[in-house]
Design a protein with these regions (language model features):
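Active-site regions of metal-assisted phosphoester/phosphodiester hydrolases
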Residues: 1-34, 77-268
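Metal-dependent catalytic neighborhoods of phosphoester/phosphodiester hydrolases
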Residues: 15-17, 40-73, 88-93, 184-193
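A short beta-strand submotif of the Rossmann-like class I SAM-dependent methyltransferase core
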Residues: 37
Length: 268
């Protein structure tokens, strides 16, 4: 099974069409099974539209939705779902999306923050889906968590909620996304996740390519100019991970966001 995660930072750049085409090309050419996306945006005042049967979500989709545009480029070969999480940059519904080549049999939208104020930029949710691939069912969550030392909405409270729902699943589970959790900081977010029993798929991989997933200044990390590893794919068991590679970094496929992506393959 091939799983890609990417914080798309969508609708924020002038070259959205090229970005979409690059992402769709990689998904198709590499035959990726599941794609977990964060910062998937649509303009709040854009026109609402109806989607075809491959959209399995319940939330309203606007005509410029980034995931909708990606679905069209993928020519209906993937099921997909989307949730809006909060207002982004005063004009977007900022949300999460998951694409799957295989049937999505269930989904859940989990509020991670104390606040449920849609207009508050620190609001966080996780989108989870159950996917059936042949005889095997597994769960994938996509999430974009906050910062360890945030006074209002600290990482630890968000993580406890995500861990509570994800750890309850009696099947393989993958947590994919932007965790704002540099792996070099001791006794903080990264080590908290590991201490709760989750496996960093990079540690399990037989072949590893790349490290940093964000380079230079990005939102929330104004002083992080040397590069950070803050995007991850975690699993709840010692999977046979074949490879873990940083992608869309300008070396391994073109840069399409202020984050790089991660592509993981295991034998599920």
């Amino acid at each position: 099974m091939k799983l890609l995660t990417l914080n798309t930072h969508s609708l924020s750049d002038a070259n959205e069409d090229n970005k979409l085409k690059a992402i769709a090309h990689v998904i198709s050419s590499r035959d990726i099974d599941v794609i977990a996306l964060q910062e998937v945006n649509q303009t709040m005042n854009a026109k609402s539209i109806s989607c075809d049967e491959h959209y399995v979500g319940r939330d309203i989709i606007k005509e410029d939705n980034f995931a909708l545009a990606l679905s069209k480029l993928l020519e209906g070969k993937y099921y997909w779902t989307y949730i809006p999480v909060k207002v982004g940059y005063d004009r977007f519904d900022e949300g999460l999306a998951i694409f799957s080549k295989h049937k999505i049999s269930a989904s859940e939208n989990t509020l991670l923050t104390t606040t449920n104020d849609y207009s508050f930029w620190k609001k966080r949710n996780a989108l989870g889906v159950e996917i059936k691939k042949g005889p095997q069912s597994f769960y994938v969550y996509t999430a974009h968590l906050g910062w360890w030392d945030d006074d209002e909405e600290p990482f630890i409270k968000q993580w406890k909620k995500l861990n509570s729902v994800a750890a309850s699943k009696d099947m393989p589970v993958y947590l994919a996304g932007d965790f704002n959790a540099p792996d070099v900081l001791k006794d903080q977010s990264y080590e908290t996740i590991k201490n709760d029993g989750w496996k960093d798929t990079r540690d399990l991989a037989k072949i590893v390519s790349g490290r940093f997933t964000a380079q230079g200044k990005i939102d929330g990390w104004d002083e992080a100019v040397d590069g950070m590893r803050i995007d991850y794919i975690w699993c709840n068991r010692d999977e046979n991970v074949l490879s873990h590679e940083v992608i869309f970094d300008g070396k391994n496929e073109p840069v399409v966001s202020d984050h790089y992506g991660i592509l993981m393959e295991d034998n599920l």
